[in-house]
């Protein structure tokens, strides 16, 4: 059955990027910073990313994460709205404030795209639970 809307999520979904592509689910990537350098949570697209991350940990370097900001959500959502209505299942508000930025961006875009539907859902779960929720919605 073909969906009548675009389903999107964040890279914290704990599913392989190839799986997300096969299900036609756009992903918004979180980032982390080590020693002032920003890295993308690329969901395994770069084969060196995970070994690099673990080398940081082994060296005692603690990666710092941050929320996805409103501007990043605006850009991501707008690109999806050009194609159709959007349901974004966000990473849990219990571990990140990003969902609040997603809601703020959605409100701004609803004014710009009054004929489009943009719904942001707080998954209230993380890791594999988040992945299962997105998979079920797909």
Predicted feature residues:
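Short amphipathic alpha-helical segments at helix-loop
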Residues: 57-61, 87-90, 118
């Amino acid at each position: 059955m073909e969906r009548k809307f675009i389903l999107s999520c964040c890279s914290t979904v704990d599913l392989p990027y190839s799986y997300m592509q096969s299900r036609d689910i756009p992903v918004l990537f979180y980032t982390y910073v080590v020693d002032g350098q920003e890295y993308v949570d690329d969901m395994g697209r770069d084969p060196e990313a995970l070994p690099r991350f673990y080398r940081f940990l082994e060296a005692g370097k603690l990666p710092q994460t941050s929320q996805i900001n409103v501007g990043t959500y605006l850009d991501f959502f707008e690109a999806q709205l050009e194609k159709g209505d959007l349901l974004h299942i966000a990473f849990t508000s219990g571990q990140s404030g990003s969902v609040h930025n997603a809601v703020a961006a959605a409100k701004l875009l609803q004014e710009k795209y009054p004929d489009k539907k943009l719904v942001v859902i707080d998954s209230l779960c993380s890791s594999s639970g988040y992945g299962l929720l997105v998979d079920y919605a797909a």
